[in-house]
Amino acid sequence: VTIFGESAGGASIYSLLATPMAKSLFHKAISESTWINADNVTDLKNANGFSESAEVLGERAIAAALDLAQVTGPDILSKMRSLSAQEILDLEHGVALIVDGWLYDKAPIEIFEEGSHNNVPIITGYNDGEGLMFIRPDRAPATLSDQRSLRVQQLGNLGVDLVDFYVAEDEGQLFDTEVDYSSDSVFIRASRELALASALTGQQDTYLYVFARNSRDPSQRAAHFMEVPYVFGTLPERAPGEDKELSQLMNDYWVQFAKTGTPNGQGLPVWPRYDLEKQMHQVLDVPISQGATDRKAQLDEMDRYMRARYEAAKH
């Protein structure tokens, strides 16, 4: 059994890798552009510095829906059952993952760091311009000073050493730098965390990719989700032949991995294993290539920052 998903689906893969309840239920995993980080994990019973407890959030939502000062009283269940389907849908409150003592007895950042996750062959990766889907040019800071002020505000005292990585060198790079920050802090750090955790356990079949093909404009980076039509072979009929070839290659990689636990096979460009020393990844582009330690300095610093935020939030 091979499980795989993208974005929210990638977050599901991340979650299944982390929970002991899924042990032995699958044999391989592919995570595309996961985004679960320590700052969007909620604890069931306790506030964790990033958010209030899941129970408090739920109680507040129910109280608001029932127009109650607090959720108490013998008639609370009847009032809850009186809600219409639409009213229930309107209660939606996004929570990425809840540490509940059952599915997870600790935060995933600890599970992956100690190597106690479900250790199966894994492909994990990200697109080189994930943030292009979420950052608009007209919303980017107008000056270098504005961008630095924004970074300092976002990163705080714990992220002082990270600020310079995400302030442009000149005003022509302001937008691209915003895209970098959005990509790295959400998707790329989390995807890389899975590769590092897997390699740390000695899992030989650990593979990391960077998807870098923008079919609309090959001179631009690949935004969030752009790899999906390539994986499923659903590019438009008018797509260039080289894009269709890349799509077939990616489909072959995914299927080969599902069958054997490695994307490598006869007639396929060699995809190097990811290990802690070389940190090699496959660049899925036209043409296919390999890279090593993709922007290692800032991503290592991003990891340290996220860990520091997590530790500070526990106290």
What residue ranges belong to the model's regions?
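Surface-exposed patches in mature extracellular/periplasmic domains of secreted proteins
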Residues: 1, 66-79, 175, 206-210, ...
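Short, flexible loop/turn elements at secondary-structure junctions
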Residues: 7, 35, 84, 124-127, ...
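Mobile gating loops/cap/lid regions near enzyme active sites that modulate substrate access
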Residues: 189-315
